């Protein structure tokens, strides 16, 4: 066998993603416990909350597109956040058929509490990496995503999140 797990980039990407997700879950959990919240925020929920914190009201379809996650999955995440009192669904003023999601006061409060620990966690992840190395790393990850589309159409950048200049599925 030519490639072993310890030499396989896909393995290391998978392993690092799992490690980061687990550690991030713990950071989020600790903040909720320290502040005696009746809920625990997951990384997926934090992704939705952070987008709402940045944008205000937004549709589930837009959340799906911006976070690169299928709409039915986002619907479930939003439902759990709504049950925890962190978000609410509101009808668009201009078109009552359109439903948007927004943060409640409690949602804004938890995002304020999470800001510093999340920033500190990101600092831990990037410790020892220069700004240029961090930028190169992001670019290389984006290249990998673009390359994946060449071998598995419909995967890779199916949500169009890569910056311009990345051509999915066009390996030389």
Task: Kindly give the residue locations of the regions a language model identified.
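N-terminal helix-turn-helix DNA-binding core of bacterial DNA-binding proteins
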Residues: 22-73, 84, 155-159
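C-terminal regulatory/oligomerization modules of transcriptional regulators
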Residues: 1-4, 132-172
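Hydrophobic structural patches
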Residues: 13, 49-52, 141
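Charged, amphipathic alpha-helical coiled-coil/dimerization segments
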Residues: 79-143
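Active-site phosphate/pyrophosphate-handling residues
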Residues: 8, 47, 72, 109, ...
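Alpha-helical linker/hinge and terminal dimerization helices associated
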Residues: 16, 20, 27, 31, ...
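N-terminal leader segment of winged-helix/HTH proteins
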Residues: 1-39, 166-172
